Amino acid sequence: MAPRKKKPSVEYELLSIPLSSYRASVDASVNPYARDKRHHYADPKIYSFGTSVELEGVCDYPEDRAGEMYTIMVNGWENEEGKFDARLSDRHVRDEDGMPIYHKVRGEEIPVYDVPEGLGLIEKVRGEKRWTGFCWVSPRTVSDMLLLLPHVSPLYIAIHERKVGRTRWINALSLQMSHPGFE
């Protein structure tokens, strides 16, 4: 019998990054897939709209990552219809017959869900004290961020990071007026 594969360890960390600069863009276009004959989608939208904001700052918490620059691209494109309206029951894992799967824990049946890994990824830039990341959020979230950016100072980026093996996921991201390390 082959040895069982070890599950990668999962670690969580809260990052606090005082915002030092930002750049924003708003896009509108004819959907590039509407004219692309190589790709066929059932019913693509004709127009494509998006808003993105790039947030930059130097991490000040936790101490072992203090002084490292972070650049996070927050994209407000809704790729799939209703992607951000999904409910946990929509992600219930099903067997080959389409029946929901449950695990028994102490005699109680607990549903098994296929939860997304995160909103986006964070990667270390090799050889530098710099990190880059991206995440997908609803267009409304990016619009709300753009309302805060020119009017409120100081602002902080709070990232709840989820590390699975060597991959770092953005589990949660917020732009806030209070320092996340002191909450």
Annotate the PLM regions.
Residues G82-T132:
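Short acidic, glycine/tyrosine-flanked loop/strand segments centered on an H-E-D-like triad
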Residues M1, L155, L173-M177:
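Aromatic-residue detector
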Residues P111-Y156, H160-T167:
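Acidic, glycine-rich flexible loop segments
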Residues R162-E183:
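OB-fold/S1-family single-stranded nucleic acid-binding modules
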